[in-house]
Amino acid sequence: FPYTTLFRSPALRRLIDGGRELSGMDYQRILLEAQRFTGQVEMLLYELDLLLAPVQPYAAPTHEQLSSLALDPEANRRLIQFTAPFNVSGHPCISLPIGLTEGGLPMGGQFIGRKGGEATLCRAGMAVQRVSDWHRLRPQCLK
């Protein structure tokens, strides 16, 4: 796979190279784990309309922090730990602003829905926005 301008990011290059190092058995184990997780989420959503989870374990990183995260695999893993699993399982999600930190950085939450349940997610998102003003808040640097 040739590197093009699109793939010059060090973080993306590291992901591609990491994928090249996986054996067929490793890949099969990953696929089985993804299927197991998807089944667990399906079982939860059989009894619930939605799941609520944070988008990330801390406030949105600054631009400088985001640039350095790309070079730190563990920090990058923490950044996506609450969103990536649902990218793998294929469950629709909607992220919503849930406020600002004392320092004025945005924080986000997400609803996770049943497969094919995008309408329910949109209704839930609209309900949150009707009773809050979080979606109108702006960081100080944007005011």
Regions flagged by a language model, labelled:
Residues 28, 88-143:
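Structural helix-boundary/capping segments
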Residues 40-43, 73-96:
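Small-aliphatic-rich amphipathic alpha-helix that forms the alpha element of a beta-alpha
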Residues 29, 60-80:
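Short, surface-exposed loop/helix-turn segments at secondary-structure junctions
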Residues 56:
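Short glycine-/small-residue-rich Rossmann-like dinucleotide-binding loops
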Residues 4-38, 42, 92-105:
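Short helix-loop capping/hinge segments that flank enzyme active sites or metal/cofactor-binding pockets
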